[in-house]
Amino acid sequence: MIQNVVGFVLGNLPAILFIAAFVLAAITRSPSYFPARLLGWLLLSVGIAYTWAGFFHIAFPHMAASSIGWQVSPFQFEIGVADVSIGIVAIVSFWRSLDFKGPVVGYLSLFSIGVAYGHFREAIYEGDYSKNNFGILLGITLIHAALLPVLYLLARKKRA
């Protein structure tokens, strides 16, 4: 039973963190503007999720590749390092200023668009509909790409 729960949580960590960001932004008692709070919590959740994914690409490349429906590649190490790097910067941004968050949001949005394109391409041309290639993770990636810049711009507008 415990093993199943742990497996479920670890296998669905990005989705759980995504939902938790909205809940925490809603219940956090803070005078800050809601989009700014949500931006912070989403960046923290994205940071943890990217660090987690990067760790798997680096330490367990066979497991990471098979969950996406891909073959193991030497490039997994590079994407793992990129994921861990932006993950750590996104985590740090939770405690930093809006000016610090801006470039993090920009990078995450552009990177997410590229990642989504790659996963769509694999689904369309290679028929790869694995859950971690063309499932909820892809949906969350697309939402991050669109929502993070909107929240950032709303927070900047309110601050101005």
What are these regions (language model features)?
Residues 1-21:
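Hydrophobic transmembrane alpha-helical segments in integral membrane proteins
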Residues 4-6, 65-76, 128-140:
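Non-cytosolic membrane-interface motifs at loop->transmembrane helix junctions
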Residues 21-25, 92-93, 144-160:
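Membrane-water interface at the C-terminal end of transmembrane alpha helices
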Residues 27-42, 95-101, 129, 160:
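Membrane-interface helix-boundary motifs at transmembrane edges
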Residues 28, 58-65, 118-127:
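Juxtamembrane "helix-exit" motif on the non-cytosolic side of transmembrane helices
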Residues 43-59, 74-91:
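Core segments of alpha-helical transmembrane spans in multipass integral membrane proteins
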Residues 82-86, 104-120, 140-147:
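Hydrophobic alpha-helical membrane segments
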Residues 94-104, 117-134:
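Membrane-helix boundary connector in multi-pass membrane proteins
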